[in-house]
Design a protein with these regions (language model features):
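Short SAM/SAH-binding signature in class I
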Residues: 237-243, 263
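Short amphipathic alpha-helix with an adjacent loop that forms part of the alpha/beta core around
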Residues: 225-237
Length: 286
């Protein structure tokens, strides 16, 4: 099958062997797959991610649920925002059948442990024609929902998870820094919960327009106006929760310096590089 293969931190389109479903697994045809910012970061800064992952694993007790680490010298197919159609089933599959359209948590498990789909040498992601998924983790796509929209399930889930972890309440306000897919997912979930005001910040006019459509009360171009200034003009009183959804060095420090006293900051963007913050900023703004 054809696939976009990453090897030694380089990407190429190549022919690779078709995967085969094992017990409890299904073979699927990829209908749509998004390009996540973390995939782009991995190409540029994956070595830092691997080194940090190995260091943390060595410092923690063994965990059978920790995904196995990929080897960059071996071929790997990225892509974890996908929608697929089942084309074949492995032994023990009793719910799914060929023709079913599904999305899934980007993880697979077998006798050797847990693997991160799209970050695994064994389980190719959605930048390929075919994928193997575990039936247990697959979710049926409602009839009539286009595949490209269904593929947004994973980034939407990341945004919803961030909002849940923030413990934001009806008496709080929110700033979302970065209005890519995950930042927009945060906006949508905040609006669904009735949080307000919500201020979004991004350099892209198109993304700012999407954020307004999804429920932002105010959007700003950070090159022209600080997000916190917009919050002060609209409200300036309610406790503030800041969602950092950019994931590049310097953003966390910028968020800490921007946020007023008593604010909470949620790290949503995936920064794979070392970063630096000034702890005294946080202490002074407690």
């Amino acid at each position: 099958m054809r696939a976009a293969v990453m090897q030694d931190w380089e990407l190429r389109v190549d022919d690779i062997a078709e995967p085969e479903p094992g017990p409890g697994q299904v073979l699927t045809k990829v209908l749509a797959c998004g390009i996540c910012g973390s995939d782009l970061h991995l190409l540029r800064h994956g070595e830092e991610l691997r080194r940090l992952t190995e260091e943390l694993a060595a410092e923690e007790p063994p965990d059978p649920l920790r995904p196995r680490l990929f080897e960059p010298a071996s071929p790997m197919v990225m892509g974890h925002e996908f929608c697929c159609e089942v084309v074949d089933t492995g032994p023990g599959v009793d719910r799914l059948e060929p023709g079913d359209v599904v999305v899934s948590m980007p993880a697979a498990f077998d006798a050797d442990g847990v693997h991160a789909v799209g970050f695994s040498n064994r389980y190719p992601g959605g930048y390929a024609e075919l994928m193997v998924l575990n039936e247990l983790l697959a979710i049926d796509v409602p009839a009539g929902l286009p595949a490209d929209l269904a593929a947004l399930t994973e980034p939407l889930a990341v945004g919803v998870h961030a909002v849940v972890k923030s413990r934001i309440s009806a008496g709080d306000a929110a700033i979302v820094l970065g209005l890519g897919p995950v930042g927009l997912a945060c906006v949508a979930e905040l609006a669904r919960l009735g949080i307000g005001p919500i201020v979004g910040a991004d350099f892209s006019p198109r993304r700012r327009a999407l954020a307004e459509h999804l429920g932002c009360h105010e959007v700003v171009d950070p090159a022209e106006r600080p997000a916190v200034a917009a919050w002060r003009e609209i409200d300036g009183v309610r406790p503030l929760v800041v969602f950092e959804a950019v994931g590049v060095p310097g953003m966390l420090d910028a968020a800490m310096r921007m946020a007023p006293k008593g604010s909470r900051i949620l790290v949503v963007g995936v920064c794979m590089q070392p970063d630096q913050v000034q702890p005294m900023v946080g202490i002074g703004r407690e």
